[in-house]
């Protein structure tokens, strides 16, 4: 089955939007604190039931799907015309957006996964020393920050896809002269 760039951009943006929404909902549903119960020589923390752990993992999975779909969409042979990856990496603008999309995707994954795993550990290991006065919870705002980075990554993948389409059209239209045309186009846009 042949895909078009529009279909691929819809897949990328759908996965990214779902990741963003799940991350925001996970941040909002996260327990603010646990209730400490003093027992013999320790404190047992009782945390309310919340869906933030499952939502955090789902947000992470959809972010990975967005990144994979974004990467795949850039190098996909549209209209049956395959181009070498080296052709795309001749464009400095494309390189910048491609690398920033990868970086924000990685940061979004870290910001989503870290508090999710931390919260899961807090729910699993509930006993703390008697000196504990407050039950620990993950830092507030990390899941929301991960959700925003996920949305940023999605938008950057879409920009990288648009730049890849421009590189593809220039190379197909101008052939081997496409590299010279690409260099002239970058010089004219930077001036």
Where are these regions (language model features)?
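N-terminal helical submodule of small eukaryotic multi-pass membrane proteins
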Residues: 1-81
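Transmembrane helix-loop junctions in multipass membrane proteins, especially transporters and channels
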Residues: 28-35, 75-79, 117-124, 165-172
């Amino acid at each position: 089955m042949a895909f078009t760039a529009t279909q691929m951009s819809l897949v990328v943006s759908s996965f990214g939007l779902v990741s963003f929404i799940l991350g925001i909902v996970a941040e909002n549903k996260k327990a603010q604190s646990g209730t400490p119960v003093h027992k013999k020589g320790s404190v047992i923390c009782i945390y309310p039931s919340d869906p933030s752990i499952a939502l955090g993992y789902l947000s992470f999975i959809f972010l990975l799907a967005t990144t994979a779909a974004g990467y795949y969409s850039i190098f996909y042979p549209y209209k049956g015309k395959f181009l070498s990856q080296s052709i795309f990496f001749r464009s400095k603008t494309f390189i910048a957006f491609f690398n920033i999309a990868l970086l924000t995707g990685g940061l979004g994954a870290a910001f989503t996964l870290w508090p999710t795993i931390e919260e899961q550990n807090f729910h699993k290991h509930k006993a703390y020393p008697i000196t504990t006065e407050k039950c620990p919870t993950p830092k507030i705002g990390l899941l929301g920050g991960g959700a925003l980075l996920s949305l940023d990554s999605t938008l950057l993948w879409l920009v990288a896809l648009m730049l890849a389409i421009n590189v593809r059209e220039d190379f197909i239209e101008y052939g081997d002269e496409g590299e010279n045309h690409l260099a002239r186009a970058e010089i004219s846009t930077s001036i």
